[in-house]
């Protein structure tokens, strides 16, 4: 029992220590992105695909080497067996061996092997670029989820602040009601407002929990329990100018974005497919080489003696001697000409041309997709910056208006309905400001990312 209890205690303390460590750690955006890239299943699958393309490239190079294959046969014969010495059948059981070693070397096949090597090089590059594209997409998704947490965190704080103000107002209104300064209806309306804000706060906290869950799922973590992120201090200068125009950013991004480069590589691959298909029209020249020998247990060796009655005298023919004496080797050349093969070569060439056109359209589509993404991000960044600047003014105005309304409410000059309306307008203005702030941050980070700048909230 003691032997069983000790390992269990160790496991419990280890788990507790791990959980405590996770609770103490706060994840930055850079750490989240790195962890996601290291643990994402889609990335791991693409790594395997890249290794697969690497093997294809290596195999295409090895195909230039000559082939060499060996074969060994051992057979038994019963009753009537051909005597290889006299070429007559004898009534005798026997055994025989045959050994063969041969292969071939491709000398010319329309440069198909060389074009296959070059094609596989570009396929490997395309696979590596696809891997980088997946990493980039995951990085952007992580950044969006991270900023969503920051936004929801600010909304929770804003809602909680409004609730605390309402609770303080309940106490003031209670005293005024006890003193007979206000009617009970005023107190009930403020209490109803507090209940509404408590429900709103619960909803905001639920949204925050969901945003944490979303991020931890992207990170492939088992649970969001104990997971926290760094809350950076982010300030926005409303007078800032977004550097670069859409066309300038697009020109820069074309040479950086892996999806564009991958589409270019795939177009090149299709062009080599056409060269390979055309190579099938060429004659094929190969060199063949072989070496063989054999052994038979019933074969006899002429001793050099001739009996006057029976004729030539034969003796045992040892295995090693037969193998040596029967050794045969040589080489030759083979030339084949494709003449008529059901128009397969012509159809393959036609299909390769169609494939080239398809990949050209694919490249054009990727460029248009990138341009539209940059165009949309640029427009969204400008709009959110303007919205943020306007919301700053709105919040300042609403805060001043609310202070004035609150002062009047405290002396009974404003009804609870007007007071609650002022609070609601202030909270909405604060929420709009937070949403515009993080939308602007994300869109500018997307534009910087297209320029080759790593995702980082500290910049």
Regions found by a protein language model. Give the residues of each.
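Short flexible linkers and secondary-structure junctions
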Residues: 22-144, 285, 289, 308, ...
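Bacterial Sec-pathway N-terminal export signals of envelope proteins
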Residues: 20-73, 79, 223, 230-268, ...
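Sec-dependent N-terminal signal peptides
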Residues: 4-13
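Periplasmic alpha-helical coiled-coil/stalk elements that build and connect Gram-negative outer-membrane
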Residues: 137-252, 380, 384, 404, ...
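Sec/SRP-type N-terminal targeting helices
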Residues: 44-48, 61, 107-135, 160, ...
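Acidic, low-complexity, intrinsically disordered peripheral segments
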Residues: 20-22, 30, 223, 432-459
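A short glycine-centered flexible hinge/capping loop motif at secondary-structure junctions
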Residues: 177-181, 409-413, 450
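Small/polar, glycine/serine/threonine/aspartate-rich low-complexity segments that form flexible
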Residues: 23-25, 71-105, 233-241, 275, ...
């Amino acid at each position: 029992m003691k032997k069983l209890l000790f390992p269990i205690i160790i496991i419990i303390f280890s788990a507790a220590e791990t959980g405590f460590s996770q609770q103490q750690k706060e994840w930055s955006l850079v750490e989240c992105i790195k962890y996601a890239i290291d643990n994402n299943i889609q990335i791991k699958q693409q790594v395997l695909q890249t290794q697969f393309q690497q093997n294809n490239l290596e195999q295409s190079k090895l195909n230039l080497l000559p082939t060499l294959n060996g074969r060994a046969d051992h057979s038994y014969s019963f009753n009537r067996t051909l005597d290889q010495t006299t070429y007559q059948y004898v009534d005798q059981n026997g055994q025989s061996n045959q050994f063969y070693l041969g292969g071939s070397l491709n000398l010319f096949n329309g440069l198909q092997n060389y074009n296959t090597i070059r094609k596989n090089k570009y396929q490997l590059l395309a696979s590596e670029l696809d891997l980088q594209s997946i990493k980039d997409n995951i990085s952007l998704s992580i950044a969006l989820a991270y900023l969503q947490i920051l936004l929801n965190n600010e909304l929770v704080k804003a809602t909680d602040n409004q609730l605390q103000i309402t609770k303080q107002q309940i106490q003031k209104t209670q005293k005024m009601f006890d003193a007979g300064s206000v009617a009970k209806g005023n107190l009930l309306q403020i209490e109803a407002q507090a209940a509404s804000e408590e429900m709103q706060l619960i909803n905001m906290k639920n949204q925050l929990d969901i945003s944490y869950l979303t991020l931890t799922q992207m990170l492939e973590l088992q649970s969001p329990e104990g997971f926290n992120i760094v809350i950076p201090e982010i300030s926005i200068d409303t007078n800032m100018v977004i550097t670069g125009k859409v066309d300038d950013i697009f020109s820069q991004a074309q040479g950086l974005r892996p999806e564009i480069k991958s589409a270019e590589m795939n177009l090149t691959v299709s062009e080599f497919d056409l060269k390979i298909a055309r190579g099938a029209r060429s004659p094929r020249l190969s060199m063949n080489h072989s070496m063989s020998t054999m052994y038979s247990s019933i074969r006899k060796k002429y001793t050099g003696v001739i009996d006057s009655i029976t004729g030539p005298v034969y003796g045992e023919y040892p295995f090693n001697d037969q193998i040596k004496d029967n050794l045969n080797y040589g080489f030759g050349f083979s030339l084949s000409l494709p003449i008529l093969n059901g128009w397969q070569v012509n159809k393959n060439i036609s299909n390769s041309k169609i494939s080239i056109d398809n990949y050209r359209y694919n490249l054009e589509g990727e460029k248009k997709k990138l341009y539209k993404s940059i165009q949309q991000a640029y427009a969204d960044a400008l709009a959110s910056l303007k919205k943020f600047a306007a919301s700053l003014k709105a919040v300042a105005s609403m805060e001043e208006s609310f202070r004035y309304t609150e002062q009047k409410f405290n002396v009974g000059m404003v009804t609870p309905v007007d007071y609650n309306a002022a609070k609601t307008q202030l909270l909405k203005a604060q929420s709009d400001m937070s949403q515009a702030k993080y939308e602007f941050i994300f869109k500018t980070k997307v534009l910087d990312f297209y320029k080759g700048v790593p995702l980082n909230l500290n910049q």
